[in-house]
Amino acid sequence: WDMTVLKVYDKYYSKAEKAVERLQKSTLEKSFIHNRLKEGNILFNYGRISIIDWDYMTVGSPLWDLAFFINRYKRKNAFYAHNKGLNYLNMEDILGAYSKNNYLTENQIEDLQAVIDYPRQFISVIGEIYRKSRKFIPVGLKMKLDEMAEQVDFEL
């Protein structure tokens, strides 16, 4: 697994640096956010939308929720659809749909892109491995590392 990390470390480090540099200039508005917004936490029932599982709720920018949702979609759906030659939503499609109900300024779009580009999952997995000084890592973490290595250059 060390070789997997070494192959992609520089790219993810560079993405993190650029994202942090952009976000330090940001003036993102803050409110309560879900912080783990994914398709399984959004329920549609009789024309109403409900969001469940608020156990990771925190204060932050609503753009963080949108970025988390987009990154999960990118990682779990778009990458594989792209490789199979199937249609998938690109960033323009996603932002177009989102903007129908939530106007985004150019600055907000740049901030959103920085949050999307920040390699949150990579940093989390690497942190978990190295914090515990593991000689052996569970299969699930190894699979996440392999997936991230495979997707490091994929953009929506």
Residue ranges and their predicted role:
Residues 104-108:
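Helix N-cap / loop-to-helix initiation motif
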Residues 1-32, 93:
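ATP-dependent phospho-/nucleotidyl transfer catalytic cores
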Residues 14, 18-21, 42-43, 47-50, ...:
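Short helix-capping and hinge/turn segments at secondary-structure transitions, especially at repeat
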Residues 20-64:
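Active-site acidic catalytic loop and adjacent metal/ATP-binding pocket
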Residues 122-156:
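ATP/Mg2+ or Mg2+-diphosphate-binding catalytic cores
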Residues 63-103, 116-134:
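Active-site activation/catalytic loop segments of kinase-like enzymes and analogous catalytic loops
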